[in-house]
């Protein structure tokens, strides 16, 4: 099991990134909540990781905090929840927001996540309620720190943001509309994704 990687951020193409560790490039998939906290390409970064072994591939998932990784592990233990849906849930909601959603049994918020229908949301809330009792007193994740990406043009940032939303399960039309509705100019793709998800969820 690969539990942690420390290296240089070589590439960042949401929701994937390449982490260079002593000359070896590890492809890692991350939730958007982790992506927002990543430094610029070329900077050092440490990720807490979870390895999924399948017959056709070994897949690495990375997280900025151990708490995020533990949430991911809790989610994929649930019946019918795979890594893709777990990442979609974690991209749409911060850890604390998801915990509060479960405590309040709030299906209306969960159904806004791609891949989550009403029945799935109701089942997730029931199954997670007892599991999340221990999470109430855990330390919260550090505030998000956005890194500027001066080299990115608006058009490429928009394209990256749309691609990331589609990878999370949103329909192309939904992703394009959400990104187009983001206010402001010269935003990084990470900020566009964050604002678009906020508007959709």
From Swiss-Prot:
Its main location: cytoplasm. One of its GO terms (molecular function) is four-way junction helicase activity. Residues 65-143 are annotated as: Domain II. InterPro entries: DNA_helicase_Holl-junc_RuvA_I, Hlx-hairpin-Hlx_DNA-bd_motif, NA-bd_OB-fold, RuvA, RuvA_2-like, RuvA_C, RuvA_C_sf. One of its GO terms (cellular component) is Holliday junction helicase complex. GO terms for biological process: DNA recombination; DNA repair; SOS response. Residues 1-64 are annotated as: Domain I. Residues 144-152 are annotated as: Flexible linker. It is found in: Cytoplasm. Residues 153-201 are annotated as: Domain III. Keywords: Cytoplasm, DNA damage, DNA recombination, DNA repair, DNA-binding. Has three domains with a flexible linker between the domains II and III and assumes an 'L' shape. Domain III is highly mobile and contacts RuvB. NCBIfam families: ruvA. The RuvA-RuvB-RuvC complex processes Holliday junction (HJ) DNA during genetic recombination and DNA repair, while the RuvA-RuvB complex plays an important role in the rescue of blocked DNA replication forks via replication fork reversal (RFR). RuvA specifically binds to HJ cruciform DNA, conferring on it an open structure. The RuvB hexamer acts as an ATP-dependent pump, pulling dsDNA into and through the RuvAB complex. HJ branch migration allows RuvC to scan DNA until it finds its consensus sequence, where it cleaves and resolves the cruciform DNA. Complements an E.coli deletion mutant. Probably part of a ruvC-ruvA-ruvB operon. Does not seem to belong to the SOS regulon, no LexA binding site has been identified in the promoter region. This is Holliday junction branch migration complex subunit RuvA. It comes from Pseudomonas aeruginosa (strain ATCC 15692 / DSM 22644 / CIP 104116 / JCM 14847 / LMG 12228 / 1C / PRS 101 / PAO1). The lineage of its organism: Bacteria, Pseudomonadati, Pseudomonadota, Gammaproteobacteria, Pseudomonadales.
């Amino acid at each position: 099991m690969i539990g942690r990687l420390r290296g240089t951020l070589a590439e960042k193409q949401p929701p994937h990134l390449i982490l260079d560790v002593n000359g070896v490039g590890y492809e890692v998939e991350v939730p958007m909540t982790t992506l927002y906290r990543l430094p610029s390409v070329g900077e050092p970064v440490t990720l807490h990781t979870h390895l999924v072994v399948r017959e056709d591939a070994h897949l690495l998932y990375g997280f900025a905090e151990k708490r995020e990784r533990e949430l991911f592990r809790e989610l994929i233990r649930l019946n019918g929840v795979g890594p893709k849906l777990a990442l979609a849930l974690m991209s749409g909601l911060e850890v604390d927001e998801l915990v509060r959603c479960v405590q309040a049994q709030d299906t209306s918020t969960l159904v806004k996540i791609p891949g989550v229908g009403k029945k799935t949301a109701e089942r997730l809330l029931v199954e997670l309620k007892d599991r999340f009792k221990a999470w109430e007193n855990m330390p919260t994740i550090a505030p998000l720190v956005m890194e500027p990406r001066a080299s990115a043009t608006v058009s490429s940032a928009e394209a990256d943001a749309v691609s990331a939303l589609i990878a999370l399960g949103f329909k192309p039309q939904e992703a394009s509309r959400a990104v187009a509705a983001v206010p402001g100019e010269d935003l990084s793709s990470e900020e566009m994704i964050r604002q678009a998800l906020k508007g959709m969820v």
